[in-house]
């Protein structure tokens, strides 16, 4: 009998210890049962809550979007645009014509220095047709030569005027076209407000916005768009970053 009583006491003691450990585990780590958090999950949630309450948002990648400008550089408006982008810490992509780059090389150098992408928009804004392939090709080459002389680098991105392109140039010239996903038709509107509304209504992550840096209304709209979308969590990057994603 004494032996049986001793075994019973041992079982009770072991059960008490197990219950105690279980309760300690609940206090320290939580449990999966009943939908509660495990220790690892609980710590992660607490960390997120601490970050949020401390003013630090959860680790979410910023939404990228790209501003692109055609036909420049313009001696007045491009400078104003570059000033505004620098103040806001925003990057852009400039698809310049060879003839304007030759006239204003200091603006091309500033674009390069401030981290913007510089692309080819042909020499004289020629549109590719079925009858002028070689002339178009020569304009691409001439503009590349102009830009390399100014910057020391070979452009690899081209914005073909009106979107007309021949994929054969990609092999021949090692150049790649950049089109757009948002066209607010700024070239035919003197109202910056209208341009802004068209862009904001279509703004999405990884969007490529087409504008022209030769109109005052376009510059005003562009800087407003940067302010507005930055406040929504967007970051303005060169178009190369968008194309790498896509």
List the predicted regions and their residue ranges.
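Active-site beta->alpha N-cap acidic-glycine motif
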Residues: 43-131, 135-136, 142, 146, ...
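Terminal accessory/targeting
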Residues: 1-65, 83-92, 205-246
